[in-house]
Amino acid sequence: MQVHLRYLLRGRAYDQIRNSVCYPKLNVKICATHSGITVGEDGATHQMIEDISLMRTLPNMTVLSTSDDTQTKWAVEEISKINGPVFLRLARLATPIIYDENQKFEIGKMIQIGEGTDASIFATGVTVAEAIKAKEELEKQGVNIRVIDVHTIKPIDEEMIIKCAKETKKLISVEDHNIIGGLGSSICEVLCDKCPTNLTRLGIKDTFGKSGKAEELMKYFGCLLYTSDAA
């Protein structure tokens, strides 16, 4: 079964998702659009910035957040092979095409873009394109960055996180989501257990969203890395 949910409904439907889908481990795929702050002028009541946190804590749930159209096609194909609940997080905002059709995609395996050793930027969804912009800008200043596309939040790719912690000087996560319980928290949990390392978390800091243009909100909440001092 496939279900499409917009911003408000994934909160209202949480009890049903928990008890009627995840508990019996039903084969239900939830495609949730209009995620994060990029719905812009719709404002705080319509900006779902807690959904990753809500969904990744549910047993049996697989959680994905794709970064472009090509990757979304791969994700839809791959989640159809999973016999169980899946949450696919999608934004309303149009995003640049990052990948060609030949890029390898595997659920639970992050994609590394670049070989830089100065910093690793872990990004998911719409923030991947922004992280790539930051990489390009910082490289002009002699700072070598690798971007890690975290298209699967759960199960998290522990191997890639540990690899980056050992190979790069700084770790940064960026997400259009509350930093409590989201991508950054997922990475911190792995680092705490397996490879204690500092992580700078960028995203919405324990607050509700605001009404405004999508790019203005991304900048306001610190999701446009090339305008920040994080690296």
Each PLM stretch: what is its role?
Residues 226-231:
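Conserved small/polar residues in nucleotide/adenosyl-binding loops
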Residues 35-37, 92-95, 125-126, 151-152, ...:
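Glycine-rich beta-alpha junction loops
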Residues 32, 186-190, 194-208:
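Glycine-rich, acidic loop regions that bind phosphate or pyrophosphate groups
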Residues 214-225:
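Short, flexible active-site recognition loops that position polar ligands and cofactors
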